[in-house]
A protein has these predicted regions:
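Aromatic-enriched
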Residues: 322-410
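Transmembrane helices and adjacent periplasmic/lumenal helix-loop junctions
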Residues: 165-186, 305-312
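Primarily membrane-embedded glycan-assembly and transfer machineries that use lipid-linked glycans
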Residues: 2-156, 160-162, 187-309, 317, ...
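Short amphipathic alpha-helix initiation/capping segments at coil-to-helix junctions
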Residues: 304, 308-313, 328-335
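Hydrophobic core segments of transmembrane alpha-helices in multi-pass, intramembrane catalytic enzymes
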Residues: 143-152, 175-178, 312-321, 379-383
Length: 410
């Protein structure tokens, strides 16, 4: 096994060196938007959590004020982060060594999922790691990296007890991973599945009950976590995109038109996947299948419900192993994979041009602005495709359960 992954380990070292060179030479500012943060300051999203822990120790309500943070940003995550024990004399561990370790683990896990001797997989792996979402998540050391590692471990784990712990921590940290509780009912004996699924929801309801006041405070500061145009991974990005569409279509008509198109695309992909065998016989005994299903749920939910910064796109990785494994079994799956690769290339180039072309060159900048506005349309198409597949898997599973119940009755 290790011999087969020898090239992967060499590639891990290569990627980590390249990332270090990019960030140490401040080349990242032409690849990711700094969001009012100094180009010499790294791990800004993690720093605000550490500063909140410090201020909480000093007696501040960090959900309302956080003078310990350089930019006075409040705490907008679950209070579980504030339970992290902090020792001032080990500040370098919290602010430097821990982020570097997690980033190295993140990069390693990504690369080890690919067969780098295959050209398509090598290209996709490289594009994903150096994509604007991944670079932004790494540059800011956003805690989505921690959630990513918790959930990918939960998909890999065979223990519902372990999964219960991992998913609970992820949910208490960022809230949206609550949908990944579906993992708890995918495998195991019926009693075991019911017990841990029920225990999770009872625990989370109790947590939200005691956390309610803090959640209200978090939403008072929603400007800190709601992404602006160009930085968003959300259907809302289409409604504010700067393109010729806004000139010819009013906002309300654009919303209606977008929702109709989304429904139409979802229906098409739902219908197209009806006769695909791998979805007809879909089960959760396979790690890639579990990862794919959880990835579908998280990406679809975040896209249609929340207004996320585009580093949330790192969870699209969850669908890659399944698509790669089955790309030769069905042309639709293969085309979706190629579309994802094309989308990565387009986003990288358009984002680079957007960040490097001077605003003073208005005619050129205006055209690039329109170019960037194409990306939300690509997002819509991709998420609608994944939504159709998700609905098809759910429909097939429901049909399978109904047949089993009918068989038991007879």
């Amino acid at each position: 096994m290790l011999k087969d992954k020898k090239f992967n380990f060499l590639f891990i070292i290569f990627v980590l060196i390249v990332l270090q060179l990019i960030f140490s030479n401040n080349q990242h500012h032409s690849l990711v938007y700094l969001m009012n943060i100094s180009q010499n300051e790294f791990f800004a999203d993690w720093n605000v959590i550490i500063s909140a822990i410090k201020c909480k120790i000093s007696g501040f309500d960090v959900f309302l004020e956080n003078p310990c943070d350089k930019y006075r940003r409040t705490h907008v995550y679950g209070s579980i982060f504030l339970k992290i024990p902090f020792f001032e004399k080990y500040s370098n561990f919290y602010l430097i060594y821990f982020p570097y370790t997690i980033i190295s683990v993140f990069i390693s896990i990504i690369i080890l999922h690919f067969n780098l001797k295959n050209a398509i997989e090598l290209i996709l792996c490289t594009l994903f790691i150096f994509s604007p979402p991944s670079l932004l998540a790494v540059e800011r050391f956003n805690n989505d990296l921690l959630v990513f590692l918790l959930l990918i471990t939960a998909c890999y784990s065979r223990s519902n007890f372990t999964n219960f712990i991992l998913i609970s921590f992820a949910t208490m940290a960022k809230f949206y991973p609550i949908v990944s509780s579906i993992i708890l009912i995918l495998r195991g004996k019926n009693f075991n599945r019911f017990f841990y699924f029920s225990l999770f929801w009872v625990s989370i309801i109790i947590f939200f009950y005691y956390e309610l006041n803090n959640i209200k405070k978090i939403f008072l500061m929603k400007d800190q976590f709601i992404a602006s145009w160009g930085m968003s991974f959300s259907i809302n990005n289409i409604f504010v995109l700067s393109s010729p569409l806004q000139i010819s279509i009013s906002r309300i008509n654009l919303i209606i038109f977008t929702l109709i198109v989304a429904f139409f695309l979802i229906f098409i992909f739902f219908s197209k996947t009806k006769k695909i065998k791998i979805f007809q016989s879909y089960d959760f005994n396979n790690y890639q299948n579990r990862l794919f299903f959880v990835g579908l749920i998280i990406c679809v939910l975040n896209y249609f419900v929340f207004t996320n910064y585009f580093y949330r796109e790192i969870f699209l990785f969850f669908v890659y192993p399944f698509l790669i494994t089955n790309k030769n079994n069905n042309i639709l799956i293969r085309n979706i994979l190629y579309f994802i690769i094309g989308r990565h290339i387009f986003f990288f180039i358009s984002n680079y041009l957007y960040l490097t072309v001077s605003v003073k060159s208005y005619p050129v900048f205006s055209k690039i602005n329109y170019l960037v506005s194409i990306k939300p349309l690509l997002d819509l198409f991709l998420i609608c495709a994944l939504s159709g597949i998700l609905l098809r898997i759910c429909a097939n599973l429901l049909e399978k359960i109904m047949k089993e119940k009918k068989y038991e009755v007879n």
